[in-house]
A protein has these predicted regions:
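Non-catalytic C-terminal accessory region of glycerolipid acyltransferases
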Residues: 4, 131-245
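Generic preference for hydrophobic
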Residues: 63, 76, 98-99, 205-207
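Short acidic-hydrophobic, aromatic-tinged amphipathic segments that line or gate anion-handling sites
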Residues: 63, 120-123, 213
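Membrane-interfacial terminal anchoring regions of lipid-handling membrane enzymes
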Residues: 1-31, 40, 67, 220-245
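Transmembrane alpha-helices and immediately adjacent membrane-cytoplasm interface residues
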Residues: 51-61
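Catalytic core of membrane glycerolipid acyltransferases/transacylases, capturing the structured
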Residues: 25-47, 55-56, 70-127
């Protein structure tokens, strides 16, 4: 029962803090600052809320494999199973353009704030043209010096589940030569999708070796990324502390 109370308190604080940071972002957009300079705001948002999750809910984290992050712009493919990685993406990798469904940028205050960072907002109902949108906009972001964050499963998956990875991130890599960095974690076991409860424990984030798309097809890049991510998640979960007791 106590963990439920803590989870409710954290959720209320999450909404309040997110609204506050949304206003700060909108005000910062009025200043002559680049996206990279303003990125300190969402980074601070992610760091603060993950710290708050540790304090209020007892949900901490570790990050492994940071030496695998390339020095040039890259595409990170993330396992998607929780809200938590939406916070963590802000500080685990360098400033990057977020790939998301366009409905997000319509949300008052928060969505408007997201829009000021020029995300890759995709109309998912557009089918194949949505992939083209992603590749075209992703190419522009990479050329500007920013990385690209992609959740190839397209939606949050329940613990232990996955689906065929979407091709857009891998296609972007093959067309631009940008390396793909797979990122695995077990956040969904502690902070499940569609659940208010945040369980105490430690989330492990593991950054995998970059995948060089040279000479590979988008399907091959995708397969390598998915195999590594899903195998690493299974490995994390199988170890002591990998999931709640």
């Amino acid at each position: 029962m106590l963990q439920w109370v803590r989870s409710v308190i954290y959720t209320v604080l999450l909404f309040l803090v997110t609204g506050f940071f949304g206003v700060v972002v909108l005000l910062s957009a009025l200043l002559p600052l680049s996206i990279e300079q303003r990125y300190v705001i969402p980074r601070s948002w992610g760091l603060f809320l993950t710290w708050l999750a540790r304090v209020v809910c007892g949900l901490g984290y570790t990050i492994e494999g940071q030496e695998n992050l390339p020095s040039r712009p890259f595409i990170s493919l993330w396992k998607h199973s929780s809200v938590w990685e939406t916070l963590a993406q802000m500080f685990v990798v360098p400033p990057a353009s977020w790939s998301l469904k366009r409905e997000v940028i319509w949300i008052p205050i928060v969505g408007w704030a997201v829009r000021t960072f020029n995300p890759i907002a995709i109309n998912r109902s557009a089918g194949h043209s949505a992939v083209n949108q992603m590749v075209q906009q992703g190419r522009e972001r990479l050329a500007s010096g920013m990385g690209v964050i992609v959740y190839p499963e397209g939606t949050r998956m329940a613990p232990g589940q996955t689906r065929k990875y979407g091709i857009s991130g891998a296609l972007l890599a093959c067309e631009t030569g940008a390396p793909v960095v797979p990122i695995a974690h077990n956040s969904g076991y502690f902070w499940r999708r569609r659940s208010l409860l945040k369980k105490a424990g430690t989330i492990r984030v593991v950054i995998g070796p970059p995948i060089d798309p040279t000479g590979l097809t988008p399907r091959e890049v995708n397969e390598r990324a998915q195999q590594w991510i899903e195998a690493k998640v299974a490995e994390i979960v199988a170890q002591p502390g990998g999931q709640p007791r």
